[in-house]
């Protein structure tokens, strides 16, 4: 209580940006401010990037939940463009850079035909019937994401590192952890290699049975644990892993026309597994790393 009184004594507003604020932390701050001061301290946010110098939207009003980035600031236009299952945020205004220095290739890719900057983030209206209530941040259109600490996770490199660390046991994987405290991996097993590790695996054993094999789980744990010893940073360290029995689906766009895993589509389709991976009390098949 004494620390809370000292913390809130002269506090009038809490501003956060660069990474999402978990809703449970938002609620705890509100509850603590009410218990200490008798009223709620205002929490607010804004949004933008280096290319928007850096402000593009802000919330100049009280918000009821985390994740609202506000409305466009004066002189700025933001349009929401359907991209897959999300709406991509694109920005235009006098604050937006005209391009990248001596990189016409990057400049051409960064803007659409109407001159809007492709920032790579997704969003949606907090209230579809009232745009004045602001835009709700909805993750990244691109694969890379931030942890709740604000640290960027570079998905492509981490995916390759995870597959190499547990080689040859993993066929492919998707990287999870947007707005989480740690990185998680959903991985497809290399069935043939996994059967070599499980001496008692019957030839006809199903993938769902195979991925519960104790010897397999132990082997994957050893490989990832060895990788973690050399990669202790939050953006590269793997905190938990779950093997998946169902292979990636072409019909569900989990595999691109080039044969690559579509990270965003896979995570969207396998959202229940992501929830299982990050559960407070995970199931036995979730491999946890200290």
What function would you assign to each model-found segment?
Residues 122, 165-193, 228:
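C-terminal boundary motif of the adenylate-forming
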Residues 96, 131-161, 194-214, 234-235, ...:
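Adenylate-forming
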Residues 1-85, 181-182, 189-201, 226:
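Conserved adenylate-forming
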Residues 81, 87-147:
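Conserved ATP-binding/catalytic segment of the ANL
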Residues 1-4, 32-41, 126-131, 164-169, ...:
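Alpha-helix termini
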Residues 43-45, 51-54, 116-125, 135-141, ...:
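Extended, hydrophobic alpha-helical segments in both membrane/secreted and soluble proteins
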Residues 171-176, 181, 197, 221-290:
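Conserved C-terminal "lid"/linker of ANL adenylate-forming enzymes
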């Amino acid at each position: 209580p004494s620390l809370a009184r000292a913390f809130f004594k002269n506090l009038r507003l809490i501003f956060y940006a660069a990474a999402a604020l978990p809703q449970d932390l938002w609620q705890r701050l509100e509850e603590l401010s009410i218990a200490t001061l008798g009223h709620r301290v205002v929490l607010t946010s804004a949004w933008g990037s280096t290319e928007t110098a850096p402000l593009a939207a802000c919330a100049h009003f009280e918000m009821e939940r985390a994740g609202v980035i506000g409305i466009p600031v004066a002189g700025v236009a933001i349009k929401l463009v359907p991209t897959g299952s999300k709406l991509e945020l694109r920005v235009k205004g006098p604050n937006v850079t005209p391009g990248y220095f001596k990189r016409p290739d990057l400049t051409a890719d960064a803007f659409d035909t109407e001159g809007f900057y492709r920032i790579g983030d997704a969003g949606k209206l907090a209230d579809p019937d009232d745009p004045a209530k602001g835009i709700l941040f909805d993750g990244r259109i691109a694969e890379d994401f931030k942890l709740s600490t604000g640290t960027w996770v570079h998905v492509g490199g981490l995916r390759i590192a995870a597959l190499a660390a547990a080689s040859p046991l993993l066929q492919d994987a998707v990287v999870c952890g947007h707005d989480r405290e740690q990185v998680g991996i959903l991985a497809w097993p290399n069935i043939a290699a996994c059967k070599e590790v499980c001496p008692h695996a019957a030839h006809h054993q199903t993938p769902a049975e195979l991925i519960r094999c104790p010897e397999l789980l132990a082997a994957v744990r050893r490989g990832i644990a060895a990788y973690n010893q050399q990669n202790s940073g939050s953006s590269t360290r793997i905190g938990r892993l779950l093997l998946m029995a169902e292979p990636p689906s072409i019909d569900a766009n989990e595999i691109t026309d080039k044969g690559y895993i579509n990270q965003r589509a896979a995570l969207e389709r396998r959202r229940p597994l992501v929830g299982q991976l990050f559960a407070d009390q995970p199931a036995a098949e979730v491999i946890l790393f200290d």
